[in-house]
Amino acid sequence: MSGFIWHTFFFDPIYNGLVYFIDTIPGGDVGLSIIAITLVVKTILLPLSIKATKTQVVMREIEPKLKELKEKIPDRQEQAKAMMELYKEAGINPFASILLMFLQIPILIALYLSVSKGGGVPLPAINVDLLYAFVPNPDTISMVFLGFQDITARSLPIALIAGVAQFTN
């Protein structure tokens, strides 16, 4: 059952999206395809990201009231009830941002496995058994990003760029 859910909602769509972009992008650049599939996923998750950001802003605004409740009410159960009531009044769900995180983790794992294992064969090979009917098998697949960086090799500059991008995000 969990394998069905994994393949239906995470791995197969990501793998097929990646292969689609490899076929669509001139030269079959896998690096650009990874960027394209990432942008598509970010766009799909944008409404959840906006909601999580709004929740965080409201949480910061009501933080003084939460501290006041904790000081005023010693009983933990009563504290929890009062806090949930405050969240309800503010119109937020404190667990909304957790949903986004739990959704992003399997998507990231699916993208990693799509590139590294690709349904049994790592890129540049394509497992045609996993392709949807409308996703063509690409003629050319280039593991060289923008014609100068082999993405299968270790690269300190790319690792540094990724670290800086993650830090600024």
Where are these regions (language model features)?
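Helix-loop-helix
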Residues: 1-169
